[in-house]
């Protein structure tokens, strides 16, 4: 069951990331999102979707049955005692217009599988007050890291319901970086240009892996408790991130993550960074195949028999900060591979001094919670 959730989220993560990354001549800009958060919101919508609408949402979640709700339920039930050494909080809520009556089966499923609270509100009479209430709840759940999720105008008197997922993560490194070892260092933006940034440093044993097909080396930095970790995907050269993004697939990423082994005496240099991104996902999800959900063709009859429901957009906002102590992050959705068999040299330098990808994931089950890339600091 849990392995299935791992597969759903991993496949969705890679598909989504490839849509969010810079494309064409636009090679600038950072990316950060929570695939888990977006997938959870979509899965809650899937529970009320029928016909082609359900098929389209299920397809991008790589799910072909209703068991995805059980998979989410199993994972969410673990959270209270899952990783006592880190803060990992996930909350779901449905805001429903007080004159709109969703089906009892739907609200029961949300409560059972997603531990979702259901709140009746007055969209018709005071939509902006509801918007502020949603924002206040998200801000509380994410420890004030996600503010103003819904901008003015995103909610109006015609809104019937809002499905919200919020996720908050704060983990201390299992082996923290010493602030005294942080020094200015070059981060290469292009082969010709670089920027001085605060570069953290430590030497230790880390799991590493290499994929010659993707021309990337991976290094895992565990958080306390070893139930969660950050993985850095470092391309071989300054312009290698675009190559990695173009050729990345879920099976390749899975093989890379599963093929890492402990490497001793690694000199690790990692820049401190902070990111915040707000994304309207309507166009992205429509391009991925979820077309009916945002139009009059939407079939959400599992939510209400009255019909005439469709989504206006899916708003996602994510935040991450990485420093010497650890990481704070928040958000309000088989191919053969050549792994390097030879051991790494006796002393390995892993200098994150060029554009790179990263992800934060849980273990047992292995679920991608956050994913992103840094091109600019």
UniProtKB/Swiss-Prot annotation:
Consequence of changing residue 340 to R: Abolishes inhibition of human leukocyte elastase and porcine pancreatic elastase. Increases affinity for, and inhibition of, human coagulation factor Xa, thrombin, trypsin and plasmin
Glycosylation sites: 11, 226
Keyword presence, Manganese: no
Gene Ontology CC: extracellular space
Keywords, comma-separated and alphabetical: Blood coagulation cascade inhibiting toxin, Glycoprotein, Hemostasis impairing toxin, Immunity, Platelet aggregation inhibiting toxin, Protease inhibitor, Secreted, Serine protease inhibitor, Toxin
Protein name per UniProt: Iris
Induction and repression of expression: Induced by blood feeding.
Subcellular location: Secreted
GO molecular function, one term: serine-type endopeptidase inhibitor activity
Similarity field: Belongs to the serpin family.
Database matches in Pfam families: Serpin
SMART domains registered for this protein in UniProt: SERPIN (SM00093)
Note: Inhibition of LPS-induced TNF-alpha release is independent of the antiprotease activity of iris.
PANTHER family assigned to the protein according to its UniProt record, in alphabetical order: GH10112P-RELATED, SERINE PROTEASE INHIBITOR, SERPIN
Chief location of this protein within or outside the cell: secreted
Tissues expressing this chain: Female saliva (at protein level). Female salivary gland (at protein level).
GO biological process terms held by the UniProt record: immune system process
Signal peptide: none
Source species of the chain: Ixodes ricinus
Function: Serine protease inhibitor with anticoagulant and immunosuppressive properties that can modulate blood feeding of ticks on vertebrate species. Strongly inhibits human leukocyte elastase (ELANE) and porcine pancreatic elastase. Moderately inhibits human tPA/tissue-type plasminogen activator (PLAT), coagulation factor Xa (F10), thrombin (F2) and trypsin. Does not inhibit human plasmin (PLG). Inhibits platelet aggregation. Inhibits the intrinsic pathway of blood coagulation in the host. Inhibits fibrinolysis in the host. Inhibits proliferation of mouse splenocytes.
Residue ranges of coiled coil: none
InterPro entries, per database record: Serpin_CS, Serpin_dom, Serpin_fam, Serpin_sf, Serpin_sf_1, Serpin_sf_2
